[in-house]
Amino acid sequence: MSTFGYRRELSKYEDIDEDELLASLTEEELKELERELEDIEPDRNLPVGQRQKSLTEKTPTGTFSREALMAYWERETRKLLEKERLGACEKDSEQEEDNSEDIQEECFTESNSEVSEEAYTEEDDEEEEEEEEEEEDEDDSDDEDEEKQNSAASERPVNCEDGRSSSHVRHKKCSNAKNSENLFNGHDGKDTENLSFKSSAIHPCGNPTVIEDALEKVRSNDPETTEVNLNNIENITSQMLIQFSQALRDNTVVKSFSLANTHADDNVAIAIAGMLKVNQHITSLNIESNFITGKGVLAIMRALQHNKVLTELRFHNQRHIMGSQVEMDIVKLLKENTTLVKLGYHFDLAGPRMSMTSILTRNMDKQRQKRMQEQRQQEYGCDGAINPKTKVLQKGTPRSSPYTSPKSSPWSSPKLPRKSAPAKSQPPAPAPPPPPPPPPPPPPPPPPVIPDKKAPTRNIAEVIKQQESSRKALQNGQKKKKGKKGKKHENSILKEIKDSLKSVSDRKSEEGSRPSTRPSTPQRSLHDNLMEAIRASSIKQLRRVEVPEALR
């Protein structure tokens, strides 16, 4: 029934003219019809990725302009690059960012998407031409006038973009001027040094160190500056770092020198190595996150062979990889170093890593032993300072004992009448009695009695040797007798049974074994006696006996 109903519905459209329907459709409806037909039956000649209709074609919902956003991103990236290379001032950057944000907001709110696309395409061409002219002429006023004339005929978004381009040009000129002031060429002498001071004094990082003042303090050997911290000062030049290392050669106060993330290179590392050979006061050095290669690191390691004070060295996270050869050379150079305790570097190879840990543990153990020795010496020194007082007290303390001793001891009675005549108030005279106590120490002489006991041991050894020689003679005689008996009873079965019951020593003697180098053992034993009794007896003569404890 369903098929009949479906055919009836189709029969309604048999009389309809398709050409008239297509002629009555509008352009939008025709486009929609084409899309539907493409979805139903796509073109087989197209690749699979292009047969599906585009699902990203949507009408813009706001006043967004892609070209304006791309131009803004390009300007920001240029600003960041200029800041990294030249070290632009913080104030100028903040003002320019505020101006660019205001201009960007106006452009986004006042420009339509379609109009802005056409306008910005024209603006891009104009900006390129203007920048080329500005680079050649370097005249700000003429460029601004040309921008105003070119933008007068265009719409407001064009004016907005021209304003932004002019601000960008101003920023570029300002940065070029700063570049000419701050760059250090190395050919200007004192003027270039002053310019380098200006460039390094102004830095956007969070390090509050003033480079000029710090360098002056290091050169003047200021007793208050025990640490020089130049971390994260990115716009400091390598020449300034070399000057710091040269100033530290004669400094005797600074204990810590750190210049992490300062773009230091091998030249700075070589200067630091020369400083470490001379300076014997710096205990901590930090050169992490720089551009130092294996050449500079090895130069510092060679300098440590002449330095016996540095205890901490950090050079991890360099721009260039050290490599396996450099790591092995580092370990070789630090084998003889006995002061380095902390090393801030992660070795990639397991061999150098393990050997370096053993070196550091060895150095820590040596320093611990030194501390223990110093403590002991201090304790002994304190005891030595106290000993004279104790001796005086000991001399004074026995004076209290003689007061009671003369009343009872016979020694003091004859001495009192002799010394009582010159002065009665001289009880210290009995001080000699303390020597009598030393006689008790003579009991230690008993240890010499030990050598008296050794004398009889020699006699015992001689007796033992005589006994062994007699036993050997007996054994040799027995061996000869047993050999004769064995020859007589070779063919008898009874002899084989008896041989099976013989001991190992008897078998070896019969077979003519070589004499052993070991000391001779007693010939007869309980086992041998038992075996002889068994051989000489018969079954009738045997009787039951208890097994001795030695054989249980």
UniProtKB/Swiss-Prot annotation:
Residues 526-545 form the WH2 domain. Residues 93-108, 115-147 have a biased composition (Acidic residues). Its main location: cytoplasm. InterPro entries: LRR_dom_sf, TMOD, WH2_dom. It is found in: Cytoplasm, Myofibril, Sarcomere; Cytoplasm, Myofibril; Cytoplasm, Myofibril, Sarcomere, M line; Cytoplasm, Cytoskeleton. Residues 526-545 are annotated as: Interaction with actin 3. Residues 1-169 are annotated as: Interaction with actin 1. Residues 51-64, 514-524 have a biased composition (Polar residues). Residues 364-377, 489-513 have a biased composition (Basic and acidic residues). Belongs to the tropomodulin family. This is Leiomodin-2.
